[in-house]
Amino acid sequence: MRANFVDTVMARLDGEVATIWATVLLRLEDRPDVALLRRGLRALVRESERLNVAWNDARRAWVPAVRGDVEVDAVLVEGAEPLSEPDAVARIINTRVDLSRDVPLRLHLHPMVDAAQGPWLLGIQLHHAIGDAKALAHLLERLWLLCAGRGSESRPLEPSTLTDGKVLLAALRQPGRVLGLASPRRRLLAQRGMGLRRSGDTAGHALLATARLTLPQGDTDLQASEVFFSALLAGVALRESPADGRIRLRMPVDLRRMLGLGRTLGNGCSAVPIELSLKEVRARLEAPRELARFLRSEVQRVLDEGVHWTTALECMAVARLVPARVLRKNARPGLIAEPRTNTLVVTYLGRMDTHFTEAPFRIRSMRSHTATWGATGLSFADTLNINTAAFQGLWTREELRDFTERVAGWASSGFGLRAEVLAP
């Protein structure tokens, strides 16, 4: 199975800094039926061609690797010892995998010490080389149906149909998208973003914290995604020194929708750099909705210019032409370069409720994580969860907590939202 340019970059970089999982973390009301989950997982893996592959780095391709029931049963890891949520989360998000051998899917079930928040934690992970968070959401919808014996109600997810060729043809329809590679402002790898102050120069275990904000009912003018992005901008502006600089967000853009490719199991995103002056962000800190509008207009400008096609070409060139040793050699230095290629990698996953309506358990709360220095956001029930991520050795737990508290405090006071922070 041919790997597209996103698969290739993710597989070739995997493990250099961390295992690149797309992770959701669920606090549950009761212990789920493990036998039911394992039956569903067996059926899911049997029908999913893309879960029956292994990465061949020499060929830069997926090769067939049919999974037996024993291998699939090992996907669900049960913990016996009650853990605190920070300890369980740290164990889950730092799980390693070998793409040349292992099933690229993991479920972790842990009993919790602080049972009042939900006595069980279920972590679900899909390796980003196989699919992104959107693909994981679709995969889980399918898993819930298989667990309920209702697999015939929908079709199995097909492997990704996003190919390098389709992206190349779409990009070439407007020559300016190719010429845009000459502009550093339109390149993901251009070192233009201000780096965040850090306490060290090594990237160790992944860290996660969450700002949980209660969304108001009926405020149709307040979009959760805009709260997410503007609160992160504010967190940077409040934390960093007063000197001017560029805040550079790296933000994914879904190409599947633009190319009409539908629901598949795979990677379907390009990414765009969103550059904003720190001075201009600071000037709007007392006017949160104005900051949200300012950010919205900048994102729209970048999309109107087709920068997502330019950066897709850039990523394609890196995936196909750059030797693996060069990719891996530059992964860690890129985190501490000054200026950096990005200040934060940020992803808003959208409203997640619809993907879990058929889940065979009751969910108390939800968080997410991607192994990066940045943040993922999601809405679930009446909450917006801003999940901030970093690495030990760059930030301490206290630094991550401080940044997350600044994000939560600004969003709470600016938009009138009740906030709490979960941090290691």
Language model features with spans:
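Acyl-thioester-dependent acyl-group transfer interface
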Residues: 1-61, 82-105, 237-424
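Non-catalytic, low-complexity flexible loops and terminal extensions
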Residues: 1-8, 12, 130-216, 406, ...
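Extracellular and analogous surface-interaction loops
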Residues: 26-31, 213-219
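Hydrophobic/aromatic-lined pockets within catalytic cores
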Residues: 131, 144-148, 232-241, 300
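Alpha-helical scaffolds flanking conserved acidic
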Residues: 119-124, 225, 246-247
